[in-house]
A protein has these predicted regions:
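N-terminal leader/targeting and accessory segments in enzymes
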Residues: 1-88
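Phosphate-binding loop of NTP-binding sites
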Residues: 10, 86-151
């Protein structure tokens, strides 16, 4: 995807980047960065994403989004909120799937897993459509069951 399409709504206007640069993926974990990907340096609770910008660039990241200027050289764009920028580029990358979905959130202290599993089952039986579930224990996408990661 061309960087101008990927960064729409994420990078401040006038940010210096090659609008025709081809980006081949998005990563926010420097350990998984592949050549040509966009690396989003998220501020962390225990460790800070900007500490890993050099590692991401050494692995071939094409561009970095970060909240403060990194040390050293490399192609980067400063954004006011890296998490919001990640949300925007992810939506662009995947074609804004939330615009086609009904999203229901369940919050609370107890009973979230039970409530979401029951809700998924009811919705599928009533509508005849498949429902997805992103939960603490697992993620369900149609009939696919995936282990939950970073919950």
């Amino acid at each position: 995807m061309r960087s101008r399409q990927l960064l729409a709504g994420a990078a401040p206007s006038g940010a210096p980047f090659d609008p025709d640069m081809e980006i081949y993926g998005i990563s926010y974990d420097s350990r998984t960065v592949r050549p040509g990907e966009l690396f989003v340096a998220l501020p962390g609770w225990r460790t800070d994403g900007p500490r890993y910008i050099r590692e991401a660039l050494d692995k071939g990241a094409a561009l970095v989004l970060c909240e403060r200027p990194p040390e050293g050289e490399g192609p980067w764009i400063r954004v006011p909120d890296a998490r919001a920028a990640l949300a925007a580029v992810s939506a662009n990358w995947f074609g804004h799937p939330a615009e086609e979905l009904t999203v229901i959130g369940v919050t609370g202290t107890n009973g979230k897993t039970t409530t979401t599993c029951l809700l998924k089952e009811v919705l599928e039986r009533v509508t005849g459509e498949k429902a997805g579930l992103i939960g603490t224990n697992q993620d369900l996408i149609g009939d696919m069951v995936l282990p939950a990661v970073r919950t």
